[in-house]
A protein has these predicted regions:
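Acidic, polar-rich low-complexity tracts and alpha-helical solenoid repeat scaffolds
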Residues: 1-182
Length: 182
């Protein structure tokens, strides 16, 4: 039971989040989790809490919440959670003074896991673009090309090929393989 109350909690947390009242959004999300542990909105609630934590700069908490989301085996949002982990590490790397390289590496690994473990996710294209961007920034065009070629062979009809082909062409151009880049 509790359908109406459950849906009210969901609507309230969405409203609070849209109003940028992050503490209230997180509180409603937690209340939903406590009172309706079997809710079909549970994964969405965890995702929302993680986004609240991420938006407020609490990357460690956001990573913990996103990790919890990736462990919900029936959730369709697991890839979204994995992508969020990558975003958090990337945010931490951008804010870091000295040890940014390690955080960028963790972000890269998180994005790679979206591609490897959640190929059904709507975030695969974004994740691959982020992976390639890391290689591109390091001027490691050969490895970026390898990533793109693997994606093109594994997902020849994916909906994110435009991003892949654009970046693939950029890297081929940088490798002086201009004929292939066309």
């Amino acid at each position: 039971g509790g359908g109406l109350l459950e849906e009210t909690y969901v609507q309230l947390w969405r409203i609070y989040f849209a109003m940028d009242r992050l503490n209230l959004a997180a509180a409603m999300s937690l209340r939903l989790q406590r009172e309706f542990p079997e809710s079909i909105y549970l994964d969405e609630a965890i995702l929302q809490q993680a986004r609240v934590a991420q938006k407020s700069g609490d990357h460690a908490r956001a990573i913990a919440l996103y990790t919890n989301l990736t462990r919900l085996t029936k959730s369709q949002l697991r890839g979204e959670g994995q992508y969020g982990i990558g975003e958090c590490y990337e945010g931490m790397a951008k804010a870091a003074r000295g040890n940014a390289e390690q955080m960028y590496e963790r972000a890269f690994q998180a994005y790679k896991m979206v591609f490897d473990q959640h190929p059904e996710s709507g975030r695969v294209g974004d994740a691959v673009a982020k992976m390639a961007s890391f290689y591109y920034q390091k001027k490691d065009y050969g490895r970026a090309v390898d990533v793109f070629e693997k994606v093109l062979s594994d997902h020849p009809d994916a909906n994110f090929l435009d991003v892949i082909l654009f970046n693939y062409g950029r890297c081929l151009f940088r490798l002086d393989r201009r004929a292939e880049a066309r």
